[in-house]
Regions:
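Extracellular LysM carbohydrate-binding repeats and other cell-envelope/extracellular binding modules
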Residues: 268-300
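Catalytic and binding regions of secreted/periplasmic enzymes and modules that target cell-wall glycans
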Residues: 162-189
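Hydrophobic h-region of N-terminal signal peptides that target proteins for export
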Residues: 10-18
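Substrate-binding/active-site groove segments that recognize
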Residues: 121-142, 155-158, 162, 186-189
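Solvent-exposed, acidic/flexible segments
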Residues: 76-87, 96-99, 119-127, 147-155, ...
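Short, functionally critical alpha-helical segments immediately adjacent to catalytic or ligand/cofactor-binding
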Residues: 99-116, 175-180, 269-272
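Primarily a LysM-type cell-wall glycan-binding module
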Residues: 234-263, 287
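An acidic, Gly/Ser/Thr/Pro-rich helix-cap/linker signature
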Residues: 4-5, 17-98
């Protein structure tokens, strides 16, 4: 009797599993969009320098990063939604320093255009600047004030780095690679391997992928719809609110009180000034800070 009951139970279990599996398989058909290999253009440049798409390894590397970028859907979509907001700030600064416009895509690859981005290695801000370089570039780096999060100042620091890297390495593409691996790291490998092009250079895995990741954003921003990203004009993040600038140099600064005293709140002030990292600042050095305040805060 027990054996018969066991057989019946086993038969029921197998039948149920078969029905579940069959049902799941049937339901899955037609529910998922096809996963496609992204098309590559016939020609491509970065910063006015040709990308050798005729080389099989170059094409495969670009395809790999296109796949990675395209199929990280939520992160990539958020990055795309933010580009109009931040490119309007970044582009004039690149032009001022003579840095090619394509470097705005490097900023996308670095931080996803999130001014609050911070890496496990300690890099921070839109350009993911490390503390040592930021300090050498004249930025303040601390727990209360950290100018790596200052959109304009960090962009200027990045530009100064890139101009110097281009002068030392000879090409903008190598300068871009050095933003990840350092000028010394790239220069040493160029000498060891006897090559002059980024695309012929064997580098640590992250740096070998780095420029291709930047290129993936260039292609995607150029035509999001071609890669399956449907974004209406009204979907893009609006520019940050118009602001007025207020200078403060008090020995101690209560940022919440400062914001209220200028007709806004701490949250909105922080969004315009992400370099402010705490509620208070002990300004013993007597530095002057230019703070952006919403020109017309309708919520106050």
């Amino acid at each position: 009797m027990k054996f018969q009951v066991l057989l019946c139970a086993l038969a029921f279990s197998v039948t149920a599993c078969a029905q579940t599996t069959s049902g799941t398989h049937a339901a899955s058909q037609g529910e998922f969009a096809p996963t496609q290999v992204p098309p590559l253009p016939a020609k491509l440049e970065f910063a006015g320098e040709a990308v050798p798409l005729g080389n099989y390894d170059t094409r495969e590397s670009l395809t790999r990063e296109m796949l990675t970028t395209l199929y990280m859907h939520s992160r990539t979509m958020q990055t795309l939604l933010a580009w109009k907001r931040y490119f309007a700030i970044i582009e004039p600064i690149l032009k001022k320093y003579g840095v090619p416009d394509d470097f705005k895509y490097l900023c996308m690859a670095e931080s996803g255009l999130n001014p609050e981005a911070r890496s496990g290695a300690g890099a921070a801000g839109l350009w993911q600047l490390m503390p040592a370089y930021a300090k050498s570039a004249g930025l303040l780096v601390g727990g209360e004030v950290d100018e790596r999060y200052h959109v304009e100042k960090s962009t200027e620091a990045a530009c100064r780095y890139l101009v110097d890297a281009k002068r030392r390495l000879g090409s903008w593409t190598l300068a871009a690679a050095s933003f990840n691996a350092g000028v010394a790291g790239v220069s040493r490998r160029l000498e060891k391997q006897g090559v002059t092009s980024y695309y012929d250079l064997f580098l640590p895995s992250e740096t070998m992928r780095y420029v291709f990741r930047v290129l993936s954003f260039k292609l995607l921003v150029g035509d999001p719809g071609a890669y399956g990203y449907r974004i209406g004009t009204e979907d893009y993040y609006k520019p940050l609110p118009e602001y007025k600038e207020v200078t403060v140099d008090s020995p101690t600064i209560d940022w919440t009180a400062f914001a209220r005293g200028h007709g806004t709140n701490y949250k909105l002030m922080r969004e315009l000034n992400p370099w402010i990292r705490d509620y208070d600042h002990n300004n013993k050095a007597g530095r002057s800070y230019v703070v952006k305040i919403p020109a017309d805060d309708s919520r106050k």
